[in-house]
């Protein structure tokens, strides 16, 4: 059941991301494609689902409120587009 919910969540996040990328092909300040910036997050999410993890390990990418860190780690912003599990 948890894997099914995670896959559905992945599909919802991916579709929202595709819509955001269609609306804004480039970031306003750097010109970098959003697709390039989001690839590591989706890779981390897919690996977590495949391994059956319920949480993300230390120093791995996370998504606040969607892909949480293992206790006692916290999902913190490390730069303007990435969040990592720090603790």
Curated annotation (Swiss-Prot):
It comes from the Eukaryota. Changing residue 66 to A: Attenuates sweet taste-response suppression properties. The keyword Disulfide bond applies. Residues 1-20 form the signal peptide. Residues 21-52 form a propeptide. Changing residue 65 to A: May affect protein secretion, folding or stability. The keyword Calcium does not apply. Disulfide bonds join 55-70, 62-75, 69-85. Keywords: Antimicrobial, Disulfide bond, Knottin, Pyrrolidone carboxylic acid, Sensory transduction, Signal, Taste, Taste-modifying protein. The modification Pyrrolidone carboxylic acid is found at residue 53. Changing residue 61 to A: Attenuates sweet taste-response suppression properties. Named after the term 'gurmar', meaning 'sugar destroyer' in Hindi, for its sweet taste-suppressing properties. While Gurmarin has little effect on the human sweet taste-response the Gymnema sylvestre plant also produces gymnemic acid, a mix of triterpinoid saponins, which blocks the sweet taste-response in humans and chimpnazees, but not in other mammals. Gymnema sylvestre has been used in Ayurvedic medicine for the treatment of diabetes and other illnesses. This is Pro-gurmarin.
